[in-house]
Regions:
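Short alpha-helix boundary/capping segments
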Residues: 28-39, 69
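Intrinsic low-complexity, disordered N-terminal segments enriched in polar/charged/small residues
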Residues: 10-11, 25, 35
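Metabolite-binding pocket within alpha/beta catalytic cores that recognizes anionic/polar moieties
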Residues: 43-175
Length: 211
């Protein structure tokens, strides 16, 4: 993240979920340089295996993100936070979504999580790395530190609005280990290899907004 961002946020939490993938090595470019042409997602997109990245308030640009195209995805749950940006990163297919929309215009309490995840899936995302800029009361966390969390505490009252289950569909997701450990360890090894200040393990507490 940029120094200006770092002065506002105590730590950056990286949330990993789903399957694993080999670590990537970024090089040069940014979503701001993406083509302005809008592409509508097609059935072919679902056949492309992609790494999904959801950027929070501290991540809008990714170095080395090439061949960029903004894509519009229709979902049965309404509109996602923004168009999704597809491209390649170190030779791998990637799809990026700015969680709060370009220009940071959507409050955390207004996010349409179901539409966001559905859109990611429709564009072939098999793994998702979600990045959030957060604060902490623990002194060991410094500005711009990365915390690879391994647990959640959900203190919101709106989880029923964000589930794919209900209305005749019953599902139970185990929450003992909500983060993909294999993917988390790959991210940890990659961060250490790059000599990035990273913390192994942590709990993300999600509070009720708006904030």
């Amino acid at each position: 993240c940029s120094p200006r961002r770092c002065s506002r946020h105590l730590a950056t939490t990286v949330v990993s979920c789903a399957r694993s993938f080999p670590p990537v090595s970024p090089t040069v470019a940014s979503p701001a340089a993406a083509t302005t042409t809008t592409h509508v997602a097609t059935w072919h997109d679902a056949l492309v295996t992609r790494i999904g990245i959801i950027g929070g308030s501290g991540l809008y640009n990714i170095e080395g993100f090439e061949n960029q195209k903004w894509r519009t995805v229709k979902t049965p749950f309404g509109v996602a936070s923004d168009q999704l940006l597809t491209g390649t990163l170190a030779g791998r297919e990637v799809v990026f979504l700015p969680r709060h929309g370009r220009g940071h215009r959507i409050l955390p309490s207004e996010l349409n999580h179901r539409a966001n995840i559905w859109a990611m899936k429709k564009l072939g995302a098999q793994w998702i790395i979600s990045v959030s800029a957060v604060g902490s009361l623990q002194k060991k966390y410094k500005p711009c530190d990365i915390v690879l969390i391994d647990q959640f505490l959900d203190r919101t009252k709106r989880s029923a609005n964000h589930t794919f289950f209900g209305n005749g569909i019953v599902g139970h997701v185990a929450f003992a280990d909500p983060i993909c450990e294999e993917l988390r360890q790959l991210l940890l090894k990659s961060a250490r290899r790059k000599k990035v200040r990273v913390h192994n393990g942590g709990t993300y507490v999600n509070m009720e907004g708006p904030a």
